[in-house]
């Protein structure tokens, strides 16, 4: 009974991760401001998942590989792939609509952001695979290398990943390219 309760709770948790994709209803395409806002909310959830995934992957690398930890990174990467597919399709449908310039800019930014978040999650899976290989080969890190990882994780933790932070990064890159 305890196992079935655990499995049921885990399934509910996984379904909840996809809740923000359900916001992307076809009927909202006729109302671009609402559709873009729902896409933004879903993309921010995707960013939270990407951040969790990269931190979990670094944790496997830093604190020791586990099959369960690897499975979780791999599972979240699959969830993020679903987000990318659903949001990308939704935003592409919006691009055919008449919209104000600011909404068009948001849609363009969000399409770039999708790629960034998906890439972050791909890197998380690569890091988790490296952690597995390190364990299989019996490789250990020097104290200096462990310290460097701690510095990276401390620097990264708490900053959050969202459309807003990615958007600033894209604007900064575009300004630098213009110079």
Predicted regions and their residues:
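Cytosolic, long alpha-helical scaffolding segments
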Residues: 1-179
């Amino acid at each position: 009974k305890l196992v079935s309760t655990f499995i049921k709770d885990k399934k509910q948790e996984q379904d909840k991760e996809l809740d923000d994709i359900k916001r992307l209803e076809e009927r909202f395409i006729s109302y671009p401001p609402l559709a873009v806002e729902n896409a933004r909310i879903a993309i921010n959830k995707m960013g939270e998942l990407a951040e969790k995934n990269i931190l979990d992957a670094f944790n496997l690398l830093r604190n020791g590989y586990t099959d369960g930890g690897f499975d979780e990174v791999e599972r979240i990467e699959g969830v993020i792939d679903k987000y990318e597919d659903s949001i990308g399709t939704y935003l592409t449908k919006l691009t055919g609509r008449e919209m104000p310039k600011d909404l068009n800019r948001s849609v363009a930014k969000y399409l770039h952001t999708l790629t960034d978040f998906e890439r972050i999650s791909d890197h998380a899976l690569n890091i988790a695979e490296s952690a597995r290989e390190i364990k299989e080969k019996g490789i250990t890190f020097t104290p200096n290398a462990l310290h460097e990882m701690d510095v990276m994780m401390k620097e990264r933790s708490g900053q959050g990943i969202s459309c807003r932070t990615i958007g600033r990064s894209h604007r900064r890159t575009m300004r630098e390219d213009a110079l």
